[in-house]
Amino acid sequence: MKKKYRIPKASVIIANYNNAKYLRNCINSILNQSYKNIEIIAVDDKSEDSSLEVLKKYKKKIKVIKNRKKTSKGSYNQINSYYKGFIKSKGKYIFFLDSDDYFKKKKIELVIKEFENNENLDLIFDLPILKFRDKEIKKKFKQKKFVISSWPRFSPQSCISIKKKLAKEIFKILKLKKFETIWLDFRIAVYYFLKNKQIYIFKKYLTYYRQLNNSASKDYKILNKNWWYRRKQAHEFVSFLNKKLKLKDKMNFDKIMTNIVNLL
């Protein structure tokens, strides 16, 4: 007699800070998924707007975690929120979602199908639909050659889906308060690439990714002082991982130029 197939549980972890304006849209995009075996965990990082009031309205449908103390290390606020949600999760597959972004209706169904059909897959990046004001933009994805820099091209945080076992391994190594300008998507992509020499891009546009005027990325306009400092931290992070993974730390033009500029 064949063993009955159990539909695996998906855990969607929403990281929120002062995004009451978009939070309903974010949560509703998960509640309305075509895939039904989903738990939703929303982690609020001491929001000062009406986010908690929004979350209260969903208390019967989602699990809410409130950070009692806001951390002060840039990207670590968000990483800490995702980690707190992760340790409470029960799903086989973990989906990260920033509270100003949202999923297409069939995203979870399609991503889990991709995982289940490819047992060697541990990590999937789908493609973002960029939302800027009233515009929606789908950029073509092209993987770059690693001649100039030390990391792969990848999609943003809300496009990450990961098996729980790998997420546990990654958080154990990457949940550290160093490299405050380096966000979770970069940490995961670089760690996985260095360890496995590739990352898997699922070439379907399944995540709406908002480009907001108050986005942290605006502080890092290309070639400004902050941009160069973050690039320096990115190279330092790669070196940190190479040491952890016992890999050779290579020098390249980008790394040399970045170090020179940061000395000026």
Where are these regions (language model features)?
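A conserved acidic beta->alpha catalytic loop
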Residues: 44-53, 69, 98
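Glycine-rich, basic loop-to-helix element that forms the pyrophosphate-binding segment
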Residues: 68-89
